[in-house]
Amino acid sequence: MNVLDHLKQKTLDEVKSYCKNTCIDAGVAMMHVSGDFNLSTLVRNANFFGFKEAMYVGGSKQWDRRGTVGTHHYTDLNHIKTEEMFVGYLKDNGYTLIAVENNIPKYSDKTVSIFNQWVFTGIDKPMFVFGEEKSGLSDYILDNAETIVTIPEYGSVRSLNVGTTSGIVMAFYRNYYEY
């Protein structure tokens, strides 16, 4: 069982209860239209940083859970079939849609660097949504986002791996939330 030492003797329900009691009111989601190996990393990161829930949008309910090292048992994970249903879910549940994307000049008016000290100011109950490795986020999601967070690149590569990006964003938000 890959849990903190003080949780090793706890039951599955006790560990899940611990996670619910220590999580913050924030969520993460990943587009999953054609399948993506990064979903398990997103779920593991959500658990590690104490996010309330993780979601995947599109595709099928089938995905490779091995990369979660069991965290999918303790962090709520929901599958939503369409982007429209996802946006509706967020509105019905009081989430603020925050897209995480890069290289999209069309949306420069609502794009902000994660290094901007005010990046999360005024955002309550965020749901950070990440695109698939090859296709990114659709215009529908970007149009419905309150803001778009980007991680500036300083080298030659165009983008980061989505799993890595999710960990960076969650770490930055958890730090903002705590301090």
List the model feature ranges, each with a label.
Residues 1-179:
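Post-transcriptional modification and biogenesis factors for structured RNAs
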